[in-house]
Protein backbone atom coordinates (compact mmCIF):
# COMPACT_ATOMS: atom_id res chain seq x y z
CA UNK A 1 0.00 0.00 0.00
CA UNK A 2 1.25 3.46 -0.89
CA UNK A 3 1.77 6.06 1.80
CA UNK A 4 2.10 9.81 1.32
CA UNK A 5 4.15 11.18 4.18
CA UNK A 6 3.82 14.90 4.77
CA UNK A 7 6.90 17.08 4.52
CA UNK A 8 6.98 19.11 7.73
CA UNK A 9 8.03 22.73 7.36
CA UNK A 10 8.55 25.24 10.16
CA UNK A 11 7.49 28.77 9.26
CA UNK A 12 9.06 31.96 10.60
CA UNK A 13 6.66 32.04 13.56
CA UNK A 14 7.69 28.54 14.63
CA UNK A 15 4.42 26.95 13.51
CA UNK A 16 4.69 23.54 11.81
CA UNK A 17 3.10 23.28 8.37
CA UNK A 18 2.46 20.16 6.30
CA UNK A 19 3.36 20.03 2.62
CA UNK A 20 2.01 17.43 0.22
CA UNK A 21 4.93 15.64 -1.49
CA UNK A 22 2.83 14.86 -4.57
CA UNK A 23 1.46 18.30 -5.50
CA UNK A 24 3.18 20.77 -3.16
CA UNK A 25 0.11 22.19 -1.43
CA UNK A 26 0.71 23.52 2.10
CA UNK A 27 -1.61 22.95 5.08
CA UNK A 28 -1.69 24.31 8.63
CA UNK A 29 -3.26 21.26 10.26
CA UNK A 30 -2.73 17.54 9.94
CA UNK A 31 -6.49 17.10 9.59
CA UNK A 32 -6.61 19.36 6.52
CA UNK A 33 -3.61 17.53 5.01
CA UNK A 34 -5.21 14.11 5.58
CA UNK A 35 -8.48 15.27 4.04
CA UNK A 36 -6.62 16.62 1.00
CA UNK A 37 -4.71 13.36 0.47
CA UNK A 38 -7.88 11.29 0.73
CA UNK A 39 -9.82 13.48 -1.71
CA UNK A 40 -7.14 14.45 -4.24
CA UNK A 41 -4.84 11.43 -4.18
CA UNK A 42 -7.18 8.72 -2.87
CA UNK A 43 -7.24 7.00 -6.26
CA UNK A 44 -3.70 5.78 -5.50
CA UNK A 45 -4.96 3.76 -2.54
CA UNK A 46 -8.11 2.27 -4.08
CA UNK A 47 -8.37 -0.70 -6.40
Swiss-Prot record:
Organism: Thermococcus kodakarensis (strain ATCC BAA-918 / JCM 12380 / KOD1) (Pyrococcus kodakaraensis (strain KOD1))
Zinc finger (C2H2-type): 18-41
Keyword Ribonucleoprotein in record: no
Cofactor binding comment, as recorded: Binds 1 zinc ion per subunit.
UniProt-listed InterPro entries: Znf_C2H2_sf, Znf_C2H2_type
Protein name: Zinc-finger protein TK0143
UniProt keywords, alphabetically: Metal-binding, Zinc, Zinc-finger
GO molecular function annotation: zinc ion binding
Protein residues bound to Zn(2+): 20, 23, 36, 41
SMART domains according to UniProt: ZnF_C2H2 (SM00355)
Required co-factors: Zn(2+)
Quaternary structure and partners: Crystallized in association with 70S ribosomes.
Amino acid sequence: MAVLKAIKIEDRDGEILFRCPRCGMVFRSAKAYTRHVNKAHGHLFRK
